[in-house]
A protein has these predicted regions:
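N-terminal disorder-to-order initiation segments that are Gly/Lys/Arg-biased
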Residues: 1-62, 98-99, 106-123
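Short, acidic/charged, Gly/Pro-enriched secondary-structure junctions
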Residues: 67-105
């Protein structure tokens, strides 16, 4: 007998973190969205070169749901982050100065039976 799944083959039980997504909508216009059902993982890979140790950082963000709340160029902060209201705040809001802040480089929607079930973003 053929068994047909009615649910996505992915368990979203680990999507229990909060992230804040920031986007520059236009000159001087910034949006902030808090997502409470997310999986956010930092990855650090070290490679040894002839001149010393070289490190590379990356991240994976999984957001379940039927919408795509993040796009390339957005900034994502682990936890509930502060408001960013001015150009000066936005310019200072960079990964080198804010621990846990990353910039999205790619967004990949994932589908199950023709419907969006989650997105994976990273950089």
């Amino acid at each position: 007998m053929l068994s047909v799944r009615r649910r996505p083959p992915v368990d979203y039980g680990k999507c229990c973190q909060t992230v804040t997504i920031y986007r520059q909508e236009g000159p001087g216009q910034y949006s902030r969205q808090v997502c409470r059902q997310a999986f956010f993982e930092f990855r650090r890979r070290k490679e040894l070169s002839k001149t010393g140790s070289v490190g590379e950082s990356s991240f994976l963000l999984v957001l379940p749901g039927d919408s795509v709340p993040v796009r390339p160029g957005d900034k994502v902060l682990l936890g509930e982050g502060p408001e960013v209201n001015s150009r000066e705040d936005w310019a200072a809001f960079i990964p080198a100065k804010v621990p846990g802040l990353v910039v999205v480089e790619y967004v990949e929607p994932r589908y199950w039976q023709g419907k969006l079930c989650h997105i994976e973003a990273g950089g």
